[in-house]
A protein has these predicted regions:
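Ribokinase/PfkB-type carbohydrate-kinase core domain
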Residues: 1-103
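Conserved phosphate-binding/catalytic region of the ribokinase-like
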Residues: 38, 69-171
Length: 171
């Protein structure tokens, strides 16, 4: 209901229905546009509050061929003026854009063992930060830390760190 956030990925059927129903219930919608499909552009994407996407997905959604991050962000902001854009850019970290506010956060250097859960961990910690009401700078930091910890471990769900591990990561 109201105050909740629904995270959708493009891996289920009825994404459009889920978006419309979430909005009807007053929920915020976070959308990870993976995998990119032709049908995706038929979804009611104007309902999305947060796009959490990588650069390939960003280019496709923005309709730009450019690999320049600024062009991707500008294209997404034009297409989806009411949404915050969270663009993950691999080893360069993450870029955030919302109504003219731009932020970025680098990655944390770790020995990568298994990247299986990196994106899911980032999404989970990003949304956890939102629900905790943290400042966006801290949300990006903690989501990046959590993702770094996850790639330093073997496995998928077993690699996801606890909140305690994340907040003590730099110490």
């Amino acid at each position: 209901g109201s105050g909740d956030i629904l995270l959708l990925q493009n891996e289920i059927s009825n994404v459009s229905f889920a978006m419309e129903e979430a909005r009807r219930r007053g929920m915020q919608i976070a959308f990870n546009a993976s995998p990119i499909t032709r049908e995706l552009m038929e979804y009611p994407l104007e309902l999305v509050d947060y796009f959490i996407i990588n650069e390939v997905e960003g280019r496709a959604l923005a309709g730009v061929a450019s690999e320049e991050y600024d062009r991707i962000l500008e294209g997404l902001a034009e297409q989806f003026p009411n949404a915050a854009i969270v663009l993950t850019v691999g080893e360069k970290g993450v870029l955030y854009y919302n109504h003219g506010k731009r932020l970025s956060h680098g990655i944390y250097a770790v020995k990568a063992v298994d990247s299986t859960a990196a994106g899911d961990t980032f999404c989970g910690y990003f949304l956890a930060g939102l629900t905790k009401g943290l400042p966006m700078e801290d949300i990006l930091k903690y989501a990046s830390m959590a993702s770094a910890i996850a790639v330093s471990r073997q496995g998928a769900s077993t690699s996801i760190p606890t909140w305690e591990e994340v907040i003590h990561f730099e110490e």
